[in-house]
């Protein structure tokens, strides 16, 4: 990927990176392990972003 990216694209990629985290441990504890995964998790090789 290009080193010089447009700011809007960089912000979109940063948002996608922040969203792509696991469910926090405190949420798992609070919900008594009902919530373990979240469906919007993205693996970089399988699902590509619309850029």
Swiss-Prot record:
Q: Mention any Pfam family matching this sequence.
A: Ribosomal_L39
Q: Which InterPro entries match?
A: Ribosomal_eL39 (IPR000077), Ribosomal_eL39_CS (IPR020083), Ribosomal_eL39_dom_sf (IPR023626)
Domain of life, per lineage = Archaea
Q: Name one GO biological process term.
A: translation
| Ranges in coiled-coil conformation | none
Q: Keyword ATP-binding: yes or no?
A: no
Question: Which UniProt key words apply to this protein?
Answer: Ribonucleoprotein, Ribosomal protein
Residues in the signal sequence: none
PROSITE patterns reported in the protein's UniProt record:
RIBOSOMAL_L39E (PS00051)
One Gene Ontology term, aspect cellular component: ribosome
Q: How does it assemble?
A: Part of the 50S ribosomal subunit.
Q: Which family does it belong to?
A: Belongs to the eukaryotic ribosomal protein eL39 family.
Q: What name appears for this protein in its UniProt entry?
A: Large ribosomal subunit protein eL39
